Amino acid sequence: MAIWQGASRRLSTGAKVWRAAKKHKREMGRPAAETQVSDRIKRKIVRCRGANLKVKLEKTNYANVFDQANKVCKKVAVTKVLDNKANKHYIRRNVMTKGAIIETEMGKAKVTSRPGQDGVVNAVLLTE
């Protein structure tokens, strides 16, 4: 069944709201990519509204980490997810989202990109 992102048919009181218009295709959604740390890279290209393309990163083991002290960016390996405010279960499953704290070869880093939307993991090195 499709994911629908329109308004609910119920009010906060529980009363039923009668719809003035039917459901439209533009209100449909898709399941989240949930980018995982893996030993291989897997991307999925999806057609979006207006014939645009969106690259969803499903699995990866690399991130572009920016070191603010030295003003240098490096492609480094990601070992695991340390913290994720989006969902506490994402830590155990090694799912990266924007704002997640990951462990890399350079040290701890915070993800600044949206891997499920951008197709790449960009992060900023955290100073300890």
Curated annotation (Swiss-Prot):
GO terms for biological process: translation. InterPro entries: Ribosomal_eS8 (IPR001047), Ribosomal_eS8_CS (IPR018283), Ribosomal_protein_eS8_arc (IPR020919), Ribosomal_Se8/biogenesis_NSA2 (IPR022309). GO terms for molecular function: structural constituent of ribosome. GO terms for cellular component: ribonucleoprotein complex; ribosome. Keywords: Ribonucleoprotein, Ribosomal protein. The keyword GTP-binding does not apply. It holds the Pfam family Ribosomal_S8e. The keyword Flavoprotein does not apply. NCBIfam families: eS8 (TIGR00307). Part of the 30S ribosomal subunit. Belongs to the eukaryotic ribosomal protein eS8 family. This is Small ribosomal subunit protein eS8. It comes from Methanococcus maripaludis (strain C6 / ATCC BAA-1332). The lineage of its organism: Archaea, Methanobacteriati, Methanobacteriota, Methanomada group, Methanococci.
